[in-house]
Amino acid sequence: MTLLLGSSTKRNEARSSQVSGYASAEHYYKSSFYDVSLIKTPVNTSSYTKTTMQSYFGRVNYSYKSKYLLAASLRADGSSVLAKGHKWGYFPSVAVAWRVSDENFMESTRDWLDNLKLRASWGSTGNAGISAYQTLPMVNADNQIYYEFGSGVTTGRIPTTLGNENLTWETTTSYNFGVDFGFWG
């Protein structure tokens, strides 16, 4: 029997700043076009993104007389990009095999059948490959609205996306059945 235990931690952090705008027509053909001070109505933007992922995993392999084989694993992943209450996912798998060719009743076939193994497996995997902050509603500073408030006009912002408080792990389950065999090896 063999046993494997492990963990991993992943952290991504990104920051950016940008100034954009338009220069007047007279600066398009001059080398000073790249001078930021000539930008008309500059727009400053910046962003910060931080994501983390914590994982724990284990695997056990068991072999009895090299004929009966078992492999089982469990992975637990926690991701900051998913919604509260859905951040952790658990992904088990199991595989079994029977090397039929090593059984006593197969002895008469050993001169031409070197290997005959039946196998089956089942497992699930998870994916949290989405952008950060999709669980939160987003408001874009460019989406201004104007409305009357008392005796004046006030500006406001409207959400560009609604947050999704149900974002969870995308889970894929797979099954595998097979026969391995070898002749005159």
What are these regions (language model features)?
Residues 1-185:
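Extracellular/periplasmic, surface-exposed regions of secreted and cell-surface proteins
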